[in-house]
Amino acid sequence: MKIPVSGISALNRSLLQIKGPDATKFLNGLSTSRFLPNIVKKKQHTIDEAENRHAKLSEIININDNWGLMHEDIYDPDNNIFVRRDGLNSMFLSSKGRVVTDCFLYSQPFHNLNGTFEGQISEPTYLIEIDSSFTSQLQMLLKLHKLSAKVSIETIKSMHSYYYYNDTAEFDEYLDFIQQEFFRSRDPVDALNNANSFIKSEVLFNPKLAGNILGFSIDNRIPNFGIKVLMDKEIGDDDNKIPVDDLFSSSFKDNFVVPEILKPESITRRRFMNGLFETQDSPKESSLLPFEMNLDLTNGLSLEKGCYVGQELTIRTYNNGIIRKRIVPIQFFEINDDNLSALDESEYLTLDPNDPVIRELQDLHSSTLSKLEITPLIEKKDSPPPEPEQQSSSPFANSKPVRRRTASSGKLLSIQDNLGFVLANLSDIENVDLYKIELPCLEGGVKHVGIKVFKPEWWPID
């Protein structure tokens, strides 16, 4: 099955507003992204000119103003930090360094073209966009750490989150142009001017809807993966909604087809096809680390921001330079010669909602996924046979030999049609990409289903 080349869809998201004089400090202490302009070197024993390049950020950014957000990529060799008004990917962690939820963070408002949002730009204001299933959990975390901070925490129900993508080479180049032209500012004044120019230029949106566009982000978790836009009105065909044709500018429509409105499932399927995991994909009781969720590869982590909740384990892992497990995409298949031959030649995930293997998976409850054993489909022939157990001379010893369970090669986290995600040992998948899982059968015994592990092509080359 192929999803449409382009499309736009509403997302099941909640938006929390953090507003007040201490909003910048407050979020800096809780999220994995940098909000304060001071630099805390990730390796104190080194002297690196690149790490000192932004020492004057504290002179440029006044944290008591509505100044924007800092965008950075920890793997950028130039160590660029851009001050921008558009949103970015981030996470909130527990005190033990485990992921509470991933999110997108926005400065509010995104723009102030013609003074449209003049009344809202007087003090630091941010929006946190999360999957709706994590709203209560994140609210509790924020309120727990609020203490005497001068911030208000409010759920915003009047905004709607939309995701647009276009999987053509032309749009990929178009997004490169947009970012180069409007989103490389290094101070708050330029950031706001560029955001205003972006709306006014009609390069993407209809400027007549400037007052309806409350937030904007380029999704660079995967380079140029799509765009996100926060609206104060719904998009659709009903009389009280904004027609999708009206959202985009004339110049945009001269170059690209007006997208069809898709269901959120299409956005989810596209993520699975591209190996992009989100917190809600795994069971609620999952306990994951940010590096396991590839946060460092999706532009959601700052290493020079100082202390924040969950920071100690995260920075220690980075400094040790050893990441043993990561979440990787997989494709399920029925184990037979035809499938093995086809998958042996396949370099990309193939979504097929009609794959017969789905019948074997559909009755699995999410809480049982991580308990399923994953082992190599073909055992290594050169593996030495297990040594026989030494018989104890004790008369009280158990004479029955003990069967030692082989260690599972990973943990199954989620299933979408015939695709899914596994938390895998990187050392295992370097050498083996075909595995099997044991599924319990109602008739008794077990049934095996095949898994092929894929390393996303957007991962950096080792």
UniProtKB/Swiss-Prot annotation:
<comment type="similarity">
    <text>Belongs to the GcvT family. CAF17/IBA57 subfamily.</text>
</comment>
<dbReference type="GO" id="GO:0016226">
    <property type="term" value="P:iron-sulfur cluster assembly"/>
</dbReference>
<dbReference type="InterPro" id="IPR017703">
    <property type="entry name" value="YgfZ/GcvT_CS"/>
</dbReference>
<dbReference type="InterPro" id="IPR045179">
    <property type="entry name" value="YgfZ/GcvT"/>
</dbReference>
<feature type="transit peptide" description="Mitochondrion">
    <location>
        <begin position="1"/>
        <end position="43"/>
    </location>
</feature>
<keyword id="KW-0496">Mitochondrion</keyword>
<protein>
    <recommendedName>
        <fullName>Iron-sulfur cluster assembly factor IBA57 homolog, mitochondrial</fullName>
    </recommendedName>
</protein>
<keyword id="KW-0809">Transit peptide</keyword>
<dbReference type="GO" id="GO:0005759">
    <property type="term" value="C:mitochondrial matrix"/>
</dbReference>
<dbReference type="GO" id="GO:0016740">
    <property type="term" value="F:transferase activity"/>
</dbReference>
<feature type="region of interest" description="Disordered">
    <location>
        <begin position="378"/>
        <end position="402"/>
    </location>
</feature>
<dbReference type="InterPro" id="IPR027266">
    <property type="entry name" value="TrmE/GcvT_dom1"/>
</dbReference>
